[in-house]
């Protein structure tokens, strides 16, 4: 049986890693061993970041809703409780968008929440 030489596969693997390491500084871009570690770590950070992004946006929406609710004389928790009792099922993303781009519409929602909480 003929001897198998793995030069082609190795070169392909090295090129793939080094192309993923484009934009890195010094040995992290040029040396395969270092570049491989840098790419693996970067992919870990990217994976973690995709999870953190969801949490960060949710907290941003809550901050925006809370600020708009307090302008209308309600706390965030009482505002959300009022909406729940009214049967309004808008999610936080939409509520935050309404708070930023349509303050009058948000005020109407806040008034509905206030009226149901007062009753």
Swiss-Prot record:
* Keyword S-adenosyl-L-methionine listed: no
**Secretion signal span:** none
Q: Which Pfam families match?
A: Ribosomal_L20
User: Which GO terms of type biological process are on file?
Assistant: ribosomal large subunit assembly; translation
- Could you list this entry's UniProt keywords, alphabetically sorted: Ribonucleoprotein, Ribosomal protein, RNA-binding, rRNA-binding
Instruction: Name one cellular component (GO) term.
Output: ribonucleoprotein complex
Q: What does this protein do?
A: Binds directly to 23S ribosomal RNA and is necessary for the in vitro assembly process of the 50S ribosomal subunit. It is not involved in the protein synthesizing functions of that subunit.
- Family the entry assigns: Belongs to the bacterial ribosomal protein bL20 family.
**HAMAP family for this protein:** Ribosomal_bL20
PANTHER family found in the cross-reference section: 39S RIBOSOMAL PROTEIN L20
- State the protein's name: Large ribosomal subunit protein bL20
Organism of this sequence:
Xylella fastidiosa (strain 9a5c)
